[in-house]
Amino acid sequence: MIIRTPHLDYYESLQTQWLVYIISIGDTMYQINQLSFSYEKKEVLKNISITFPNNKITAIIGPNGCGKSTLLSHLYRLLPSKDKITLNQKPLESYKGREFAQLVAVLTQSRDSMIDDFLVKDIVLMGRYPYKQHFGTYSADDVKIA
């Protein structure tokens, strides 16, 4: 599963990010069941239920403040989902760090991102990080694939 929030030229003139892509690869599938979330008293997500099917691209479109980033924060566990989100039919909170990292990668694109300091090969290799052992190096196969 790769989640990315592209900064499109057309929307740059509006100085906002309106579009979120959720790309599901292989058998990885997210399912959300009646997720609600509030920042203090402001309700941002209200009873959201959606399935992001495997091998599909899902676009979430909306203006600033409608909950796109909040939804993503739940999907990659920056905010608690209280068993309202499953990944491959297993509650999101039940995944251990490395196991979750092997299933989900997040790539954001924005002007202030430090991603500009990396080569494409470096970014691709970052996706292999959860498979390395502590203080390990990338295998020859990892480097060849990248």
Language model region names:
Residues 59, 98-110, 117, 121-125:
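ABC nucleotide-binding domain signature
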Residues 42-43, 98:
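Short coil-to-beta microelement around the adenine-binding A-loop and adjacent beta1/P-loop entry
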Residues 37, 47-52:
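Conserved A-loop
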Residues 75-76:
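Helix-to-loop junction immediately C-terminal to a conserved catalytic motif
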Residues 113-146:
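ABC-family P-loop ATPase nucleotide-binding domains
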Residues 61-63:
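The feature captures the beta-strand-to-loop junction immediately N-terminal to the Walker
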Residues 30-32, 43-47:
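Conserved structural motif at the start of ABC-family nucleotide-binding domains
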Residues 83-93, 100:
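Conserved ABC transporter NBD signature motif
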